[in-house]
Structure formats: C-alpha cells, structure tokens
A protein has these predicted regions:
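Glycine-aromatic-enriched surface loops/turns that form tight recognition elements
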Residues: 2-81, 85-153
Length: 153
C-alpha cells in the first residue's frame, strides 16, 4: 500500500511541475478577429476564405455590364472578377442581416450575379435575402448587383 501511495504522490508532483512549466510557456491570447474587415478604399477582406471583395454601388446592372465592371476595376491594384456560386454561398450568413451577409457589404440589389453561365443567354445568381439560387437572362438588370472578388494580395 505504501508503494502505491508513493507512486501516486510522485505522479501528482510530476503533473503539478509539468503543468506549471507548461502554463508559463503558453502564447499570449489575441483578441478574436472578425471574419470580414473593410479597408478605407472599400475592399472587404474575408479572413476565413482569403478573398477580397468589392461592392458595385449600382444595383441595376445587366450581366455583361457587371462582368465588364468587375474585370475593369482598378481599386487596390486590380485583378478583380465576378465570383463563382461557391464563393457567393461562402459569404451567405443566415443570421447576419436582412440580406444574410455581413453588414459591411451594404448590397442594394435583390440578386447577385455569379460568373457561371447556364447557357448562351442566362447566368446563375444568388438571392441573399432567401438563399435562393437561380438563373436569369443576361439582359435582365433590374435588382441585379455585382460583387467583385479576387484572391487576397
């Protein structure tokens, strides 16, 4: 019995010594960074996916106009394009706001264009207000908005 007592006491001492030395080497805790941050030039960085986003202020754009706007955007060095459906779905946030995305985006349209063509005359898009994926004629612009995206630089 004395042997078990000594073993238990030694184990307890080892745990206490090891625990104390480990506690002294733990890294300093940093405050939690928000998923999205917005720079002064309007670029929104998604720290989870590593993508940069930029919102087109015009809420009524046809697909070709939206695509030309994104590809011609020179903010923060250029390299912009329209997002894929997967990229759009990645920023959807069920409980974020009426539009179900971070308020930093301040999107004014009902539907957001993607870069994915359905056929020669229609394109896929996402309605953030109800998470509905659908396709629309390239020539329809009412309530359609563009977001530009690029890999973070």
């Amino acid at each position: 019995m004395a042997r078990w007592y000594r073993l238990g006491l030694m184990a307890l001492i080892l745990v206490m010594v090891w625990g104390c030395s480990t506690a002294q080497t733990l890294p300093e805790v940093n405050p939690v960074q928000p998923r999205f941050t917005k720079a002064g030039d309007g670029v929104i960085t998604d720290h989870l996916t590593g993508l940069d986003w930029y919102v087109n202020p015009n809420p009524d754009q046809k697909f070709r106009e939206a695509k030309a706007w994104a590809e011609g955007l020179t903010v923060a060095g250029g390299g912009w394009r329209l997002p894929t459906m997967a990229e759009l779905k990645a920023i959807y946030q069920k409980d974020a706001s009426a539009y179900h995305m971070d308020p930093l985006f301040q999107v004014k349209g009902a539907w957001v264009w993607s870069s994915e063509l359905r056929n020669d005359w229609s394109v896929w898009g996402l309605a953030f207000y109800n998470n509905l994926q659908g396709w629309h004629s390239m020539d329809y612009g009412n309530g359609r908005v563009a977001l530009a995206v690029r890999s973070r630089r």
